[in-house]
Amino acid sequence: MIQSQTQLNVADNSGARKIMCIRIIGSSNRRYAHIGDIIVAVIKDAVPNMTLEKSEVVRAVIVRTRKELKRDNGIILRYDDNAAVIIDKEGNPKGTRIFGAIPRELRKLNFNKIVSLAPEVL
């Protein structure tokens, strides 16, 4: 469960290392975001000499959360960190590589480019 002011790791090579959620896209008063939700975030830590810089406002899709994800078949997934992938307005990732495992639910939400770049899909 990601809410406003939550810090997340960035799971791609776009140049950002840490982001902070400032808004959840969807309903106007939505409190929590889960895997597959799009958020508006600000970059808190970035790699020097890259396209994305600190204090830049970006959109990101959540790919891992520490809160459990329950599937219909009874499997429960929980990751070690909260992580997101930075995307553009069309939903394509800004980076060219994805780090770490990605849940299968992203394919149902039409983030096929992110799923194809991921090294492992759980």
UniProtKB/Swiss-Prot annotation:
One of its GO terms (cellular component) is plastid. It comes from the Eukaryota. Pfam families: Ribosomal_L14. GO terms for biological process: translation. One of its GO terms (molecular function) is large ribosomal subunit rRNA binding. Disulfide bonds: none annotated. Keywords: Plastid, Ribonucleoprotein, Ribosomal protein, RNA-binding, rRNA-binding. SUPFAM superfamilies: Ribosomal protein L14. It is found in: Plastid. CDD domains: Ribosomal_uL14 (cd00337). The keyword RNA-binding applies. PANTHER family: 50S/60S RIBOSOMAL PROTEIN L14/L23, LARGE RIBOSOMAL SUBUNIT PROTEIN UL14M. Part of the 50S ribosomal subunit. Belongs to the universal ribosomal protein uL14 family. Binds to 23S rRNA. This is Large ribosomal subunit protein uL14c. The lineage of its organism: Eukaryota, Viridiplantae, Streptophyta, Embryophyta, Tracheophyta.
